[in-house]
Design a protein with these regions (language model features):
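Non-catalytic alpha-helical scaffolds and adjoining flexible linkers that form interface surfaces
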Residues: 5-196
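Short aromatic-glycine-enriched beta-strand elements
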Residues: 1-3
Length: 196
């Protein structure tokens, strides 16, 4: 079973039978795929056929740091979005975010934080500094910069790995508050290791 996000179906699980040629490489975190949906009238679990990678994402796949980020970001999407949830514009926002990360050649260490803040906006509750400040603990100035700077400027906000990790956790708590659910992201520990 592969979990997907699409314009038509929102978040949904599908049965897949990967061929010998491409195999599981098709299903790396945040891959952008094209496929034919095969509905099953006897089951709510449909299948995918003719699966192809729409974009090779070589800028992500060639970087251990970006691959680690995609593991974290895909888990955030999985834990936050419910099966069948269709949010207007969310699919296009995700595609744009993935392609942006793929295109970045340097200065992407703050990307996870910016992704989480923009994800909240895509879900309909874009954070203002006043809204997110109670979640930020000791790093309010850095969070303010992440919110108020342009995208390119926010990638250059200086911060240590500890600050980066804390801001990711703050953004996750903000998402939990607004989605009224606990978001347990196991890959957060991997991200912590990546940024020390």
């Amino acid at each position: 079973v592969v979990h997907t996000l699409s314009r038509e179906y929102g978040r949904r699980g599908f049965i897949v039978r990967p061929g010998k040629k491409a195999g599981m490489a098709l299903f790396l975190p945040l891959n952008i795929l094209e496929a034919d949906v095969v509905e099953n009238p006897k089951s709510e679990l449909w299948s995918l056929r003719g699966i192809q990678v729409r974009d090779s994402l070589s800028g992500i796949r060639g970087s251990i740091r970006k691959n680690t980020m995609t593991l974290f970001l895909s888990e955030v999407l999985f834990r936050t979005l419910h099966d069948g949830a269709v949010e207007d514009g969310l699919y296009q926002w995700c595609i744009g975010s993935i392609l942006t990360l793929n295109a970045m050649e340097s200065d992407f260490a703050n990307y996870s934080i910016r992704f989480l803040l923009e994800f909240a906006g895509a879900l309909g509750f874009r954070p203002s500094f006043a809204d997110i400040a109670p979640f930020t603990q000791d790093y309010a100035p850095q969070m303010r910069s992440m919110l108020e700077c342009s995208f390119s400027e926010s990638m250059l906000v200086p911060m240590s790995g500890q600050v980066r990790n804390s801001l990711c956790e703050s953004a996750l708590r903000y998402l939990e508050y607004h989605t009224d659910q606990t978001i347990r992201v196991k890959s957060l520990s991997v991200l912590r290791e990546l940024y020390g």
